[in-house]
Amino acid sequence: MTGQAALERSVSSHRLSVRSRLEGEAERAESAISRTDGDDDTCSELQRVTALELPSAEMLEAFTQRRPLARLVNLVLSLREWAHKSLVETEQRPDSFLERFRGPQAANDQSAAPADAPKKTFKERWEGFVVSQSDDIYYYWLFFIALASLYNWIMLVARACFDQLQDENFFLWVGLDYLCDVIYILDTCIRLRTGYLEQGLLVKDLAKLRDNYIRTLQFKLDFLSILPTELLFFVTGYVPQLRFNRLLRFSRMFEFFDRTETRTNYPNAFRICNLILYILVIIHWNACIYYAISKALGLSSDTWVYSGQNKTLSFCYVYCFYWSTLTLTTIGEMPPPVKDEEYVFVVFDFLVGVLIFATIVGNVGSMIANMNATRAEFQTRIDAIKHYMHFRKVNRTLETRVIKWFDYLWTNKKTVDEQEVLKNLPDKLRAEIAINVHLDTLKKVRIFQDCEAGLLVELVLKLRPQVYSPGDYICRKGDIGKEMYIIKEGQLAVVADDGVTQFALLTAGGCFGEISILNIQGSKMGNRRTANIRSIGYSDLFCLSKDDLMEAVAEYPDAQKVLEERGREILRKQGLLDESVAAGGLGVIDTEEKVERLDASLDILQTRFARLLGEFTSTQRRLKQRITALERQLCHTGLGLLSDNEAEGEHAGVPTHTHADIHAQPETHTRTSAETNSEEET
């Protein structure tokens, strides 16, 4: 007994020591975690992992000497480590690359609310509750209301026509009916609190929302759909026909279909399913009406109505549905009608069947055309290339390479023109989509890691995807450099002039070609390519032209310096930089750019000269018109005109100046001076 007590005391003391050691390690780990959380965002995840390393290797080695106790301790340590990891790493760290591009985002209402704010009661939350039509909860609610509406559209008419269906499951129908009524009432309450956009902002004023909903036609239909027509059951009994007002809620079902078509990734397939559903509902209604007419005229009363030989519900409905399908699809092969009522119903069915057939042909044809539009356009391009190569008698090897390149595009779904698809979006959304799509690639590019967000937006929007086949040269040494490239997928090899010797391997995320388009002063190669780069397999690249890069970098001098310095480093390593000349940066302009600028300046000068010439011609025309008008005015007043006697005197050489002539001479002189001045101005 004494030995057993001593053993128990030793085990308990050992457990206490183990517990104290574990608690000490846990406290040190928690303090390390708190210090790690207090650092800035630049701390690495490795620090978090090392802070959670509980316990040390020596401690575990000491525990493993006692196997039962070691297993227990290992279990405790594993549980503690798992608990710490789950507590520390529950929140995912934001991506700094995306945060720098997107900028500060507005916090949601819960995070923006102060911590010491009083908790709102249910009544206060309900008074401020407003549903936005763009929320997911609104879409999910549309799903339930669409189910309730579809249930009424299918089952009410069937229960009204087939008495056996109504009687066999009476309590089930009562429960489902009142469940749909509850959903309808809740939907009306939600519609009273459904916000709408006004000047781009969500309206949350409950009084305004209520007035806006009440003034619509939909409110009147919704109100009629929830009228308690079941009160008439006390007079007529539980007749499903009294619940036909529930069918007025059909607009919510159509709204759900429209939103689903917008959200789904397979809109064409959904449209086909939606069309099939409409057709089945129409056939179902027609089958029920056919049975109701047969029952009203008398079962087996003639050859056209339902015979009623088999009284089972399933056979009865299947036969009516079969008759309705043959009639609406205009197949016929059914007994002809006998009575006038039967003829009217069959004629109406034929008209509806023609409309259904036309709808099916039109919709299915357009859907199939839309589904195959991309393939048809792609096949047209292939056929045009094949025809051209056959017409120009291109060799078989090159033709095979072209066909394989097209096959690669189609197999890897690279036939979509991104610029054409995204052209209707604003630049901000286009840039954000491009960032999310090409994020992994852009993160690996060193040139983009420190650039400003505005430059990143411009560069991403200017990138053009290109696909190269195995063995294609992206650029050759000595070529004029007009583009730089960023590798998205694939591998490229820097090869010698023979095309076989491989110097380096470029993988996804690398960029090249920027040296030849930067126009760095002191570069011995100028704007020429400095290496041969060849595609090993199929490679997806992003191309950025020289004009686009210069246009974007011109407004960001810091990024311009980074590009310049990186280009100098590469040239210095390759021995292609003349340090004595390398004093400038990207300001060097080659001859081609100078000629382009001179052409632009010449166009501007020609435009200005044409404008000045037009102004001169217009001014000259106005002056001539003024001189002509002045001459006509002088002639009209008689100034400067000679009478017959004065004319004879002038011919005889006798001066015949009168007093009026003396007074007229200064005026004539004045007119001559005015004309002289006008001519001088001209």
Swiss-Prot record:
Residues 1-41, 649-682 are annotated as: Disordered. SMART domains: cNMP. The chain crosses the membrane at residues 137-157, 170-190, 219-239, 273-293, 312-332, 344-364. One of its GO terms (biological process) is sensory perception of smell. Residues 20-30, 658-672 have a biased composition (Basic and acidic residues). It is found in: Membrane. The keyword Ion transport applies. InterPro entries: CLZ_dom, CNG_cation_channel, cNMP-bd_CS, cNMP-bd_dom, cNMP-bd_dom_sf, Ion_trans_dom, RmlC-like_jellyroll. Its main location: membrane. It comes from the Eukaryota. Gene3D superfamilies: 1.10.287.70, 1.20.5.170, Helix hairpin bin, Jelly Rolls. One of its GO terms (cellular component) is intracellular cyclic nucleotide activated cation channel complex. GO terms for molecular function: cAMP binding; cGMP binding; intracellularly cAMP-activated cation channel activity; intracellularly cGMP-activated cation channel activity; protein-containing complex binding. It holds the Pfam family CLZ. Residues 158-169, 240-272, 333-343 are extracellular. 3',5'-cyclic AMP binds at residues 455-577. Disulfide bonds: none annotated. It is a multi-pass membrane protein. Keywords: cAMP, cAMP-binding, cGMP, cGMP-binding, Ion channel, Ion transport, Ligand-gated ion channel, Membrane, Nucleotide-binding, Olfaction, Sensory transduction, Transmembrane, Transmembrane helix, Transport. Olfactory neurons. This cyclic nucleotide-gated channel is activated equally well by both cAMP and cGMP. Belongs to the cyclic nucleotide-gated cation channel (TC 1.A.1.5) family. This is Cyclic nucleotide-gated cation channel.
